[in-house]
Curated annotation (Swiss-Prot):
Organism name: Homo sapiens
Site, as annotated: Contributes to anion binding: R399
Principal cellular location given in the protein's record: membrane
Protein name: Prestin
Entry similarity comment: Belongs to the SLC26A/SulP transporter (TC 2.A.53) family.
Effect of F101Y: Decreases salicylate inhibition
Short motif Involved in motor function, span: 158-168
Protein's GO biological process: bicarbonate transport; chloride transmembrane transport; chloride transport; cochlea development; fructose transmembrane transport; negative regulation of monoatomic ion transmembrane transport; positive regulation of cell motility; positive regulation of cell size
Record GO terms (molecular function): bicarbonate transmembrane transporter activity; chloride transmembrane transporter activity; chloride:bicarbonate antiporter activity; oxalate transmembrane transporter activity; protein homodimerization activity; secondary active sulfate transmembrane transporter activity; spectrin binding; sulfate transmembrane transporter activity
Ranges per topology, Cytoplasmic: 1-75, 127-137, 197-206, 283-291, 368-370, 407-410, 465, 505-744
Alphabetized UniProt keyword annotations: Cell membrane, Cell shape, Deafness, Glycoprotein, Hearing, Membrane, Motor protein, Non-syndromic deafness, Transmembrane, Transmembrane helix
Gene: SLC26A5
The protein's assembly and partners: Homodimer. Interacts (via STAS domain) with CALM; this interaction is calcium-dependent and the STAS domain interacts with only one lobe of CALM which is an elongated conformation. Interacts with MYH1.
NCBIfam families: sulP
């Protein structure tokens, strides 16, 4: 069989033939029978809600304590090795990040270790993701540090501070108190949102928004770390233009940089960059990524202790790491009114980052995460953790990739990582007291590489979507210069405005028919597509509501070229001209009405006398005109039907319904029918609820599809032509005749 025969057979088998009636809405409803649905009464719903069965109790436990579902099904032989390797790899990364992110949060380093321990244990019981790593995250830590520095600035005067050391300790204690308060409030917000099933709020933080926000946060983190890398003493700034002030402060003090601190930092920086490139290039051959950050911490601590860098070269180090866990403490709730804006921003950003990474890894491994339960889990981790003096946590992107990439199967890997942190807190913390802050600064800056790579989004969005590019840029700029809290608020407002813009300014298309098919496509896109004579098909790809209803009406007239007002005016002008030509001045005042009015024959133009004044009845303008009048007709005057394609309209509000009713009436006044094609059940309900079908005859305007509407229009016109061409009956010729009396 040659290719020509194959193509013939393929073409024959790819055709379909359907024979059915033209489905207007009434005809289709006659063929359908609605299923009887008996709605549950309120009493039945309450009874069902408060009914207690073993299965229901089990499902509730599974929902709020996911560990009770996956732990009994734990496949020990398959999972234990992967969880063990993953836990160790994540733990050695979590140690330096916990210390470094505490610097971002403007609290002593030990509190970064607390935040790497308590929340991880709680998330193991409460979280639905098996792979993400919970704990300190650079962006959230920076936001915590921003509010802590705003309320407790570097130059604050602490009453009772005898010397600089005591003053610094008192200042740090106040910042810890602020961090605990904002962490508690953000946790309460997350928990309440989860209980109220508001997990969907993450959808308002679109990917361009999140990526623009995290890129701006990366710039904030980078500028915050420069002072530690250069070893200079500068004031820490927060709020509007803080990134500018921080950069200027570092540059002004660059002449005072600590060469030893910079040298150690650059050495670690180069080691980490080269090592990460090695890990990436040979990741298929390595059983696990080399824990570069841990080696950097060990090496930096060893060099600092061996050469006594703190005393000999005045290098800033981590300092005291007290052993043991602190007893629970009550956060200061009196600060809530000062930090609620920051708490809301931290709660939303923390959840958005967490659910984004959780869904990515869940899709990769074939399971689902519950956004509402993730909110509850984060809320409890933060609110309960604040009692143990932790600061707000989230999902760490870099640690999550390590935990998943090294073979982690469940959150037992996270538990093992937290136990390693506990070992440092209880026994070995003093070993890291000589660690230079420049090493931690280099670790943080290197881990920002992935966020800085998001600048490559700009050419991508430039090619694909200017609106998403606008969201990215406005989010980045506002978050960079207004601060992360107000920047996020601005970004969300901009994102919502783009939604309004998209629906207010949708694309409008005039459709034509692909010959010998029932397919209707944009006539401006393809040469083969042709308009059907006398019919205009108009499509919108958005809902019709108060923000775009007038624009829709205007676009309909502009795109189709059929404007009822223009047609009416042209007809009046033509009639006046025609009246003058036939010498009948009174006809110039005649009224033009729709074509299907019930006026026929000579009586249609026969004058009547009333109170001595001669009046003419309305003149009927049909689809054909004398040649003398046709010269004055506008281009759209030969159109008899406008079909509105509603297949892409998902709702229409009361303002849209009024606009639609006005369109139907306006076109009807000049003898043009308006059909609605492809209305969804929701749109039909909206039209019914807003009394669009108050006149039952309007149901005849609804058609199941564009093709049904086209065929219905053509059938109507054919019947009208047949009726017009039929010879008049005897009764029409002799309207006053009386029927003959039959003979007896």
């Amino acid at each position: 069989m040659d290719h020509a025969e194959e193509n013939e057979i393929l073409a024959a088998t790819q055709r379909y033939y359907v024979e059915r009636p033209i489905f207007s809405h009434p005809v289709l409803q006659e063929r359908l029978h609605t299923k009887d649905k008996v709605p549950d009464s309120i009493a039945d719903k309450l009874k069902q809600a408060f009914t207690c069965t073993p299965k229901k109790i089990r499902n509730i436990i599974y929902m709020f304590l996911p560990i009770t579902k996956w732990l009994p099904a734990y496949k020990f032989k398959e999972y234990v090795l992967g969880d063990l390797v993953s836990g160790i790899s994540t733990g050695v990364l979590q140690l330096p990040q916990g210390l470094a992110f505490a610097m971002l949060a403007a609290v002593p380093p030990i509190f970064g270790l607390y935040s790497s321990f308590y929340p991880v244990i709680m998330y193991c019981f409460l979280g639905t993701s098996r792979h993400i790593s919970i704990g300190p995250f650079a962006v959230i830590s920076l936001m915590i540090g921003g509010v802590a520095v705003r309320l407790v600035p570097d130059d604050i005067v602490i009453p009772g501070g005898v010397n600089a050391t005591n003053g610094t300790e008192a200042r740090d204690a106040l910042r810890v108190k602020v961090a605990m308060s904002v962490t508690l409030l953000s946790g309460i917000i997350q928990f309440c949102l989860g209980v109220c099933r508001f997990g969907f709020v993450a959808i308002y933080l679109t990917e361009p928004l999140v990526r623009g926000f995290t890129t701006a946060a990366a710039v904030h983190v980078f500028t915050s770390m420069l002072k530690y890398l250069f070893g200079v003493k500068t004031k820490r700034y927060s709020g509007i233009f803080s990134v500018v002030y921080s950069t200027v402060a570092v540059l002004q003090n660059v002449k005072n940089l600590n060469v030893c601190s910079l040298g150690v930092g650059l050495m670690v920086f180069g080691l980490l960059l080269g090592g990460k490139e090695f890990n990436e290039r040979f990741k298929e051959k390595l059983p696990a990524p080399i824990p570069l950050e841990f080696f950097a911490v060990v090496m930096g601590t060893g060099i600092s202790a061996g050469f006594n860098l703190k005393e000999s070269y005045n290098v800033d180090v981590v300092g005291t790491l007290p052993l043991g866990l602190l007893p629970p403490a009550n956060p200061d709730t009196s600060l809530f009114h000062l930090v609620y804006v920051d708490a809301i921003a931290i709660a939303i950003v923390g959840f958005s980052v967490t659910i984004s990474m959780a869904k990515t890894l869940a899709n990769k491994h074939g399971y689902q995460v519950d956004g509402n339960q993730e909110l509850i889990a984060l809320g409890l981790c933060n609110s309960i953790g604040s009692l143990f003096q932790t600061f707000s946590i989230s999902c760490s992107l870099s640690r999550s990739l390590v935990q998943e990439g090294t073979g982690g199967k469940t959150q037992l890997a996270g538990c093992l990582a937290s136990l390693m942190i506990l070992l440092v807190i209880l026994a070995t913390g003093f070993l890291f007291e000589s660690l230079p802050q420049a090493v931690l600064s280099a670790i943080v800056i290197v881990n920002l590489k992935g966020m800085f790579m998001q600048f490559s989004d700009l050419p991508f969005f430039w090619r694909t979507s200017k609106i998403e590019l606008t969201i990215w840029l406005t989010t980045f700029v506002s978050s960079l210069f207004l601060g992360l809290d107000y920047g996020l608020i601005t970004a969300v407002i901009i994102a919502l405005l783009t939604v309004i813009y998209r629906t207010q300014s949708p694309s409008y298309k005039v459709l034509g028919k692909l010959p010998e098919t029932d397919v209707y496509i944009d006539i401006d896109a393809y040469e083969e597509v042709k308009e059907i004579p006398g019919i205009k098909i108009f499509q919108i790809n958005a809902p019709i509501y108060y923000a775009n209803s007038d624009l829709y009406s205007n676009a309909l007239k502009r795109k189709t070229g059929v404007n009822p007002a223009v047609i009416m005016g042209a007809r009046r002008k033509a009639m006046r001209k025609y009246a003058k030509e036939v010498g009948n001045a009174n006809m110039a005042n005649a009224t033009v009405v729709k074509a299907d009015a019930e006026v026929d024959g000579e009586d249609a133009t026969k004058p009547e006398e009333e109170d001595g004044e001669v009046k003419y009845p309305p003149i009927v303008i049909k689809s054909t005109f004398p040649e003398e009048m046709q010269r004055f007709m506008p281009p759209g005057d030969n159109v008899h039907t406008v079909i509105l394609d509603f297949t892409q309209v998902n709702f229409i509000d009361s303002v849209g319904v009024k606009t639609l009713a006005g369109i139907v009436k306006e076109y009807g006044d000049v003898g043009i029918y308006v059909y609605l094609a492809g209305c969804s059940a929701q749109v039909v309900n909206d039209l019914t609820r807003n009394r669009f079908f108050e006149n039952p005859a309007l149901w005849e305007l609804l058609f199941h599809s564009i093709h049904d509407a086209v065929l219905g229009s053509q059938l109507r016109e054919a019947l009208a032509e047949q009726e017009a061409s039929a010879p008049p009956s005897q009764e029409d010729l002799e309207p006053n005749a009386t029927p003959a009396t039959p003979e007896a």
